[in-house]
Amino acid sequence: MNTSDFDFNLPEALIAQTPLKKRDSSKLLVVDHQKKTMKDTHFDHIIDELNSGDALVMNDTRVLPARLHGEKTVTHGHVELLLLKNIQGDQWEVLAKPAKRLKVGSHISFGDGRLKAIIKEELDHGGRIVEFSYEGIFLEVLESLGEMPLPPYIHEKLEDRDRYQTVYAKENGSAAAPTAGLHFTEELLSKIEAKGVKLVYLTLHVGLGTFRPVSVDNVEEHQMHSEFYSLSPEAAQTLKDVKANGGRIVAVGTTSIRTLETIGNKFAGQIEADSGWTNIFIKPGYQFKIVDAFSTNFHLPKSTLVMLVSAFAGRDFILDAYKHAVDKHYRFFSFGDAMFVK
C-alpha cells in the first residue's frame, strides 16, 4: 500500500482559514459506505443521523496555548517552543526552533521572565525535553504568555481563541484541537440528548503527529507518535449498556475513534475503563471492533487520517466522496466542513 494511493487534488482556495460565524452552520456530507450513497446537508442536521439509544462519543481534551516565544538568556536570540506533552512535573517534550542552537543546559526566558526553561535532553527532529520554572500556577502563566498552536496551513490570525476549542473542552493537554468537535454547539448537543442519544466523553490529548506528513512511500513503514488517552469507568459502562441494548457507538472525530479502537484491541473487542498511551495506526485492512459510525472533517491528501477513514468506508468510495466535496466547494481541514460516515 503506497502513500500516493491516498492522494487527491485539492485547490488551495478550499482550505478554510477562519471558522464560520456559527459553529453548526458548516456543511455536512453524509456518506453510507454500504449503500454507496452521498447526501449534502448542513451540520445541524447531524441529529437526523442519530437514533435514540445511540451513544455520541466526544473527546473533551482542551488545547493549550502551547506556542511560546522567548529568548536565550545569554545571546538574546529568539526561540520558539511548542509544547507537545507533559513528561512529569514541570518537564515537557517540546518542538524547538532553532533546535540546533538549543543544546543541553541552554537557558530560555519568556515574557518578562515570569517563565524560564532549561534544556534537559535533545531528541530527534528538533525535539527537546525542557524543565520550566515559574511562580504561581503553570497553566495560568501559559495562558498569559502562550499562543494557540494553529496548524501550519492556517495563515490567518485567530480572532477568538475559543473557536479553536470545542464547547465541551475540559481536560488540558492538547497541542491541536480535535476538530470534528468544533461544529457542535451547546444547543445542538442538548437537542441530541433530548432525542435519547447518550453523550459520552473520553480524553485523548492530541499531539503534533496529527499534522506530520507521511514521509515514507510504503504506508507500512510509517510510525505514529504516542498520545495519552483515558476512558472513565462511568463512560465505559454507558458504552457497554448502549452496545448491549443494540445502540450504535458514534464517534466524533478520529481521536475518539483511535481511543475506542485502542481499547477494543486491548480488551478483545470489549469496552473497559482504561488509560495509557496509544500509537494505533488505523489503515485499510483494519477490522473495527467498537465504532459503528463517526463524524470527521476533511483531511489532508496522503494523511494517516484519510487512511483511517478509508479503512472504515473503503479507499475508492472515500476518494469519490472527497472528489464530490471538492466539486461542491466544501471547506477543508481544521476550520472546514464535516462528513458523517456510516
UniProtKB/Swiss-Prot annotation:
Lineage: superkingdom: Bacteria
Keywords: Cytoplasm, Queuosine biosynthesis, S-adenosyl-L-methionine, Transferase
A Pfam family reported for this protein in Swiss-Prot or TrEMBL: Queuosine_synth
Assigned EC number: 2.4.99.17
Catalyzed chemical reaction(s): 7-aminomethyl-7-carbaguanosine(34) in tRNA + S-adenosyl-L-methionine = epoxyqueuosine(34) in tRNA + adenine + L-methionine + 2 H(+)
Example GO biological process: tRNA wobble guanine modification
MF term (GO), any: S-adenosylmethionine:tRNA ribosyltransferase-isomerase activity
Family: Belongs to the QueA family.
Role of this protein: Transfers and isomerizes the ribose moiety from AdoMet to the 7-aminomethyl group of 7-deazaguanine (preQ1-tRNA) to give epoxyqueuosine (oQ-tRNA).
Protein name, UniProt field: S-adenosylmethionine:tRNA ribosyltransferase-isomerase
Biological classification of the source: Bacteria, Bacillati, Bacillota, Bacilli, Lactobacillales
Gene, per the UniProt record: queA
